[in-house]
Every structure is written in C-alpha cells, then in structure tokens.
Amino acid sequence: MESIVNAIITSTNKIFENQARIANNITNISTPGFKSELELKILLPSQKDQNSQEDNFLYKQYKNKNQGTLRRTNQPLDCAIIDKNDWFVIKIDPKTIAYTKNGHFKINSNRQLTVQNHPVLGEDGEIFIPKNENIVISSDGYINIIKNNVLQHKVAQFKLKNFDINDLTYKTNGLYLLNKNNKLNHTNHKNVSNIKLVSGILEDSNVNLEENMVEMISNARKFDMQIKILSMYNENTQAASRFLNLNY
C-alpha cells in the first residue's frame, strides 16, 4: 500500500515542478530575449517493453535555443543581438556578472546605462551616457554621439560574451549566470570581437503561449487524477480497516 502513496507523491512532485516551469515561461512572455524552458520525455531503456506509465519515463528540462521574433520599436536605446550565442554582460551586484538577451536599455538618474535596473557593461566597464546628446547605437556595438548626422564621439562599446545557453543557468527576469560546474569563467572567456547588433529593435521572448496553456491544463488534469486515486486509496483503506474490525 505504501508503494501506491509513494507513487502518487512522486507523480505529484513532477506535476508541481512542471507547473512551476510553465508558470515561469508565461510570466516572462513579455521579457525581451527570454528563452523558454521545455520538457523532454524519455522512455527508460529498461522499460521499453512495458506499459508506458509515468514512472517509466525520465523527464528532463531544457532551454529553447531558438531566437525570438525581432520586433521594431524605433527606440534609440533598444537593440537586439544577431548571433543567438552572444549575450549582453550585466553587473547585478559588485561580485556577480549575469548575461541577458534583453536589449531594452534605459538611462538611470546617474546617467548610467541599465537593463532592469542593473548596469550594462562595456569593454571599459560601466557605461555612462552624456546628457542632452543624440545617441545612436551602431551595428558593431558602439554607442555614438551624433550631431548633424556627423559622428562626434564614441561613448563606449558593448561587451558581449559568446556562450551556448546550456553553459548558463537561469536566474530571474531573463538574466542568466554561468554554470558553477562549467570550466569557462567570465574573466578568461574572450569577449566577442565581431559584434553584430540591430538598433531600434528588440528580440521578443520565444515563449509559445498556446503550447504553455495546453500544458498547464494537461498538468491540472493529471493533478486532479492523482487526488482522485489518493481519495480512492483512502476509502479502500478505511473499508478494509472496518472489515477487519468486524471480524475481531
């Protein structure tokens, strides 16, 4: 009997984990550059000749590498990265570097270039934008001051790093950290030398809302089924207990 309860607990935990993944995808559907997480269902080799029950499968979550739709905004501080393996470098605290595809940049009260309130890093460190200047981001990643269609000054060049998304661990709000067990690290990994950006454009998230909603409904049904099985198990246990009490 305990094996039934353990199976229900295991299945329910899988459902909760999957539901958390789906909820995170839907929450970040409007986060520029966010990469959705998908689930891979693998039939265990030793179980191929048995009935296809849930316990016979291995579930593995993985990141969707596909680039999101490039959407024109015409905002001078918006830009998207062309190469799917290139990432903007963000400082989320004095000791922590993160990576993002989110090119929806803003200037804070200190004239610092930020994304989601975190400083964006250039080749020479944090980037500060002069006041009352016409800013243009060029395709090679330079932030330029333009006056009368003439280049006056290059403020900075974005620092980009090249990582496969599997080298990164998701943190929050479209920000990723380098895997702790990865042999690479921020300091010894070379910066991208051939930067390719498009300005006035953002990369949308690659979340498929319809697919995630279907998965969420399916998970809810699976959860209801587990609750019904548990209820039936409790009823059968109580009936067996009453039967035994009548015979003693």
UniProtKB/Swiss-Prot annotation:
Localization (cell): Bacterial flagellum basal body
BP GO terms, sorted: bacterial-type flagellum-dependent swarming motility
Pfam families: Flg_bbr_C, LlgE_F_G_D1
Coiled-coil residue spans: none
InterPro entries per UniProt: Flg_bb/hook_C_dom (IPR010930), FlgE/F/G-like (IPR037925), LlgE_F_G-like_D1 (IPR053967)
Superkingdom, taxonomy of origin: Bacteria
Keywords, sorted A to Z: Bacterial flagellum
Transmembrane segments: none
Entry GO terms, CC: bacterial-type flagellum basal body
Principal place of residence: other
Subunit structure of this chain's protein: The basal body constitutes a major portion of the flagellar organelle and consists of five rings (E,L,P,S, and M) mounted on a central rod. The rod consists of about 26 subunits of FlgG in the distal portion, and FlgB, FlgC and FlgF are thought to build up the proximal portion of the rod with about 6 subunits each.
Family that this chain belongs to: Belongs to the flagella basal body rod proteins family.
Protein name per the record: Flagellar basal-body rod protein FlgF
Protein species of origin: Buchnera aphidicola subsp. Baizongia pistaciae (strain Bp)
Upper taxonomic lineage: Bacteria, Pseudomonadati, Pseudomonadota, Gammaproteobacteria, Enterobacterales
Record gene name: flgF
